[in-house]
Amino acid sequence: MNFEHTSVLLKECIEALDIKENGIYVDGTLGGAGHSQEILKVLGKEGLLIGIDQDENALSAAGERLEEHGTKVKLVHDNFHNLDKILENLEITTIDGVLLDLGVSSHQLDERERGFSYMQDAPLDMRMDRRSGFSARDIVNDYSEKELERIIKEYGEDRWARRIAQFIVQERELAPIETTHQMVEVIKKAVPKGARKDGPHPAKRTFQAIRIEVNQELEIIEATIEAAAKHMKPGGRIAIISFHSLEDRIVKNVFRRLQNPCVCPPQFPVCKCEKEQMVKIVTRKPILPSEAELEVNPRSRSAKLRVAERV
């Protein structure tokens, strides 16, 4: 199976994880296994990589690529949100590092029938995990106008959210919206012509919003970081690559909260809440792709890497 994906910030991620030879590492977004392959190069015979992906195509292709590493690899078909359960099933209590790449893989974008891309016509789907029964089609055809406006505004940060929601509802009253091409045409009608001259494709933000809603992407980030920190050995690291401001803001804020969890009023001279620091932030500012990487992989342009270390 051909599952091509160019790993973003590859060298930077491996350095950030500060890999211990016999450590246990979790790649929560296995994808094309590019990051995992580099982690395995550093791991010794006693080391272990746990690769998690909810996309069965990615998992199958990664299994073939990583087959030579034998028992050093355990692959799990699941969502990284279930990290607690996954580690429990593997009878693992502590780990040395976690890597999350929150972007949609190049393969998923390019695989027309998955319905992630506004550049190719396909059924409205956008499910990362195709075992799920809930797809983009359900959102577009079943959500109320107010619900559509909310997700397009919050998750897509689109100034035309209200108009787009109105036009979606008007269009689906005539006939269900079934394909990405239909969806793009509705958005083009909704966004004024003058606003379409500059900036990204008019459908980019709405497609992002719907994808986030289908896969509940933002809700699971915070819980996963907390679970990773709970299982992390002191000195272990959490490295997270985000691709838009909503994700990056969540990662930054959760890291800050875990670094300074005290909820006591500022006038208290001594902490009384007894909430203990779990991590220290390694990256004061996010690590960005180099110019060299941008030339090779333009899709990496919006990537940001943040790292925290367990204390």
From Swiss-Prot:
Which SUPFAM superfamilies does the annotation name? Putative methyltransferase TM0872, insert domain, S-adenosyl-L-methionine-dependent methyltransferases
Compartment(s)? Cytoplasm
The Gene Ontology biological process terms listed for this entry are: rRNA base methylation
Query: Which reaction equations make up its catalytic activity?
Result: cytidine(1402) in 16S rRNA + S-adenosyl-L-methionine = N(4)-methylcytidine(1402) in 16S rRNA + S-adenosyl-L-homocysteine + H(+)
A Pfam match is Methyltransf_5
Q: What does this protein do?
A: Specifically methylates the N4 position of cytidine in position 1402 (C1402) of 16S rRNA.
The protein depicted here goes by the name Ribosomal RNA small subunit methyltransferase H 1
User: Organism, per UniProt?
Assistant: Alkaliphilus metalliredigens (strain QYMF)
